[in-house]
């Protein structure tokens, strides 16, 4: 499915929450799951592929076999983030509204090849991964759950160790994406018909 990437007027080198955004242009891209950006490229995830575009919207690289080499079987990529030359992707085997083999797969941002995975902690209560964000200040990776949006789940980015879950109030239903900026978590949600 072809989606569009909206290029906003925010400098990507700085992770600051702005007060006003204006649409500058629309860039047609493959994929419709997640979008991340660094100072040179846009990264887009489809359910089963990763794409890399330059700032002019030209396809620079793609990985249509992103599940190769993963320690656990998977069939779905959700949200992504990019930090320090690595793409962090929420990945799972998704079947009938539940996720299994949830993991944060880490890819090289230059080649889009898999490097390692951060294992999911089943005792956390998380049953699916829809949103993913890297907290650059706290050195954490956060995952959200579309099925049960009461919590977000945090992992140490360097060690991969599960750290904690945070109870959200009020509870955002049907979360789709999350992003960390300036110590705040931004959460997007859909209407339940994703």
What are these regions (language model features)?
Residues 170-194:
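Loop/turn-rich, solvent-exposed surfaces of beta-rich toroidal or solenoidal domains
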Residues 44-45, 95-102, 145-150, 191-194:
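Short, solvent-exposed loop/turn segments at conserved positions within beta-propeller repeat blades
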Residues 101-110, 155-156, 194:
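Beta-propeller blade signature
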Residues 59-94:
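Blade-loop segments of beta-propeller domains
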Residues 22-48, 76-79:
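Beta-strand-rich domains and repeat architectures in extracellular enzymes and scaffolds
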Residues 23-29, 64-72, 118-127, 166-172:
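Surface loop/turn motifs at the tips and blade-to-blade linkers of beta-strand repeat domains
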Residues 37-39, 82-84, 134-138, 180-182:
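Residue-level detector of Asp-centered blade-edge/turn motifs that repeat once per structural unit
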Residues 54-58, 108-112, 156-160:
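Short loop/turn segments that connect beta-strands within beta-propeller blades
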